[in-house]
Amino acid sequence: RGTVDLYDAKTGTVIDHKVLGATSLKKFKADGPSEQYRTQVHLYATGLRLSGANVRHVGIVAWSRSGQLKDATYWTEPYDEDRAEQCLQRLDALKQTTGLLGRGALPLIPTADAHCTYCPFYLPGVTDVEDACAGHDKEAK
């Protein structure tokens, strides 16, 4: 779930806003956005493109949660429909797998390191996926 924060029709740019803590903002400035953030903004761009918008670029503005406006940073790249399509294909595969095998198949599916803390299904330490998701397992192969 999410919504497009900003679309600049003149430049064809979809922009997402993120409010980050000091550590996350420092990492964003050094390494750019996470794969999850990048994919998210490309998905938003795909939605706009399907509704008729002329999308050419995506961008993320990272704002400091506790700092000043001057601490904000902006990242951008060309719109990549393939990135969004790969995400949608993975979602379809997950739906098919759980449709055939049930939700008990979820622990068998590799996860990506993500921002689980903000997910409504995240419950650290849960062992029954019928109840919730324990989040990314860094030890899983």
Annotate each predicted stretch with a short phrase.
Residues 25-30, 70-73:
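Short acidic, glycine/proline-rich loop/turn micro-motifs
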Residues 30-38:
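Active-site metal-coordination segments of metallo-dependent hydrolases
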Residues 2-28, 44:
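Conserved catalytic cores of phosphodiester-cleaving nucleases, focusing on short active-site segments
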Residues 46-141:
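Metal-dependent nuclease catalytic regions and adjoining charged, substrate-binding loops involved
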Residues 37-49:
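An active-site-proximal "capping" alpha-helix that borders the catalytic cofactor pocket
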